[in-house]
Amino acid sequence: MISVPDLQLDAKALLRACKLNVFDFDHLVAGQPTFAPYESDVRPAPVMDFTSGFDTWIEQVKTNSPKNLKTVRYKERKLGREQGELRFEWASPDPEVLRTLLAWKSDQYRRTGRVDRFAQPWIVELTDMMHAEKSSDFAGVLTMLYAGDVPVAGHFGLRTATTLVGWFPAYDTEFARYSPGIVHHLQMAEAGANDGLHMVDMGKGGKEYKDWLKSGVLYVAEGRISRPSATAAVHWMGRTPFNKARTIVMDRPSLYRAADRVLKGFGRVRSSMQQQESPNAAVKEPTGAR
C-alpha cells in the first residue's frame, strides 16, 4: 500500500469502501500493519543488490557459485564467437521487440504445461500500456540481448527510481545451449546498475539461478481478506485449497520436481497433438501477443 510509514487501516472497512468482497494477495510486502493479521504465508524473495556497486555484487555471485559464473561467462563468449557480436539493449522502446519477447514467453508457458497468460488480450494490453510508461518513478523496462542482429534473450519488468521488479524473462530456444537467459541477466544487472538502480527484485519462486545471483532477500506475503458474502465463500472454495496444495508442493523439492515433470509432459503431449492436427503449420496457440 502506498501511504505514510506505519499507517494502519481497518482492512475490512477498506474492502467495503472499495466495494470488494475479497482481497486475495500475493507478493505483498510483508509486515504492513493493515495486512499483517491476514498473512497466511511469508517467503523470501531473492534480490540483486547494487547499493555497494556492480563490482561488489558480481563478487558475491562469484562467491555463491564460482563454477556457475565461470560456465556462464564461457557460454557468453562462445555465443558471441559462433552467432555474432553480443549487444545488449536497455529500455528498448520498440513494440515489435516486446512482441518477440511475449511470443517466447507464450511458447515457454505452453512447452512447460503452464497457462499462457498472453492468450488473454487484456494482459497483453496492460503490458503494452506499462511498456509505454516512462516516468522517473515508474516505467516499464524492456531489455534484449542480441547476437549480431538476432535477438536471443530478453526481459520485461517494472521499475521505480531505484528498483527493477523481475517479471517476464524469456529466450529463443534455438540458442538454449548457450544459456542465453542467464547471460542476459548478468548483462541486465550491469546495465541496470549503470542506470542508477539499487536493486533487482527477482521475486519468490523456485528457479535455481536466483539462488546464485542473489545478494540479499526481501520478504513478501500472501493471504486473504474477505467480508461475509456468498461471493467470498465461492472464492474460498475455488482458491484456498489450491493455494494450500501449491504451498505444500513448493516446500518439498521432490514434489516440486514431480509436478514440474508432469506439467512438462502435458506440454509435450499438447504440442504433439497440435502438430498432428496441423502437420504443415507451426505449433501456435491463440495468443494476445499480436
Where are these regions (language model features)?
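Acyl-donor binding region in acyl/amide transferases
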Residues: 1-44, 158-218, 224-225
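Active-site/acyl-donor-binding loops of N-acyltransferases
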Residues: 31-63, 161, 195-257, 262-267, ...
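Short C-terminal domain-edge/linker segments immediately following a structured domain
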Residues: 54-57, 76-81, 117-122, 132-133, ...
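A conserved beta-strand-loop-helix scaffold within acyl/acetyltransferase catalytic domains
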Residues: 26-49, 53-177, 271-290
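A general structural signal for well-ordered secondary-structure junctions
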Residues: 20-21, 85, 107, 136, ...
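Serine/threonine-rich low-complexity intrinsically disordered regions
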Residues: 3, 10, 94, 134-137, ...
